[in-house]
Amino acid sequence: MAALVRPARFVVRPLLQVVQAWDLDARRWVRALRRSPVKVVFPSGEVVEQKRAPGKQPRKAPSEASAQEQREKQPLEESASRAPSTWEESGLRYDKAYPGDRRLSSVMTIVKSRPFREKQGKILLEGRRLISDALKAGAVPKMFFFSRLEYLKELPVDKLKGVSLIKVKFEDIKDWSDLVTPQGIMGIFAKPDHVKMTYPKTQLQHSLPLLLICDNLRDPGNLGTILRSAAGAGCSKVLLTKGCVDAWEPKVLRAGMGAHFRMPIINNLEWETVPNYLPPDTRVYVADNCGLYAQAEMSNKASDHGWVCDQRVMKFHKYEEEEDVETGASQDWLPHVEVQSYDSDWTEAPAAVVIGGETYGVSLESLQLAESTGGKRLLIPVVPGVDSLNSAMAASILLFEGKRQLRGRAEDLSRDRSYH
């Protein structure tokens, strides 16, 4: 049997060689058929040149001028091609969320709760514009959640080193987003310290000796709008007393439109410590919510003591006046704050404006501070029968009026110097 197998093996080997040779020749013929001849030479010696089709002309190497024009027409493609190289050279890496990954949900639970936010010292920023403003101001990022890599590449690469980068589905970001149209990127930052922040030079150049003190502001939308107005007017600082909504709440950040990263914001202050944050010789002015006609209807005693005219305070004064008649006791402990129209001059010295909430008004401590610094109540007159102005609107009116007065004083001073 072995003798039969051995000859068969030697017979099969030549057959394989023949098949391989035939297959190689067949492939060569097929490849030759695919080619189009350039010149045909017949046995008679006649030569026929084949003409190329108009659409199959050989490509010409682009000239240097045309290449430059092409680059100018496609700047986005060129910049996009450079971005990955910068990203790769930086050595940044990101993780991709796996099914059932709870990192996003656990972090969102912390940053959306004020007690956890203050305990952990972290805030949530959403959107490329707000995140870019925070990075430029020197805020410290801790973690980014994004749905597309292009969103992350728009941020400064040097600011992303050492930061946890996690790619998640857009649906997951949409579930936790407070925006109507989520932008596909969320950033977790350490709570900014105003001492370590670097604010824009243009903001510092237009800064005025004008401060804002927020007293019992509970509405996030109002506070965010007020901060935006303060940044636009050129306030040098904003102080928030205890009882105000957290300045770093997501709704306040969204309404502020980046104002948090243009000026110092000092949060959660006791009234005893507020004077420590005021420049020397600062006068404190309190915004009054009542109009001239409502002011005239108040009792002389309430008007003299400078209370904001809401029903709660007027009832309190009525009770106090009746008690004075019975006991004959004096109420010298109440602050005496004069009333002044908001458009009269009140910026001859550094000024701080106190804005109270719409529900509770300004506090007794704010009036005491205004009395001790020689400040006044700034009255914004309204038409009889119209309710008090919105806190954000009143703050905008007073702050931009203060800016107008300060600019006018600066122009008068420069004019006097030019004369001399």
UniProtKB/Swiss-Prot annotation:
Chain segment of the transit peptide: 1-40
Molecular function as annotated in GO: identical protein binding; RNA binding; rRNA (guanosine-2'-O-)-methyltransferase activity
UniProt EC number: 2.1.1.-
Region (Disordered): 49-88
Superkingdom field: Eukaryota
Pfam families: MRM3-like_sub_bind (PF22435), SpoU_methylase (PF00588)
Single GO biological process annotation from the record: rRNA 2'-O-methylation
Gene Ontology cellular component list: mitochondrial matrix; mitochondrion
Residues holding S-adenosyl-L-methionine: G356, I380, L389
Keyword hit for Ribosomal protein: no
Purpose: S-adenosyl-L-methionine-dependent 2'-O-ribose methyltransferase that catalyzes the formation of 2'-O-methylguanosine at position 1370 (Gm1370) in the 16S mitochondrial large subunit ribosomal RNA (mtLSU rRNA), a conserved modification in the peptidyl transferase domain of the mtLSU rRNA. Also required for formation of 2'-O-methyluridine at position 1369 (Um1369) mediated by MRM2.
Name of the protein this chain belongs to: rRNA methyltransferase 3, mitochondrial
Lineage: Eukaryota, Metazoa, Chordata, Craniata, Vertebrata
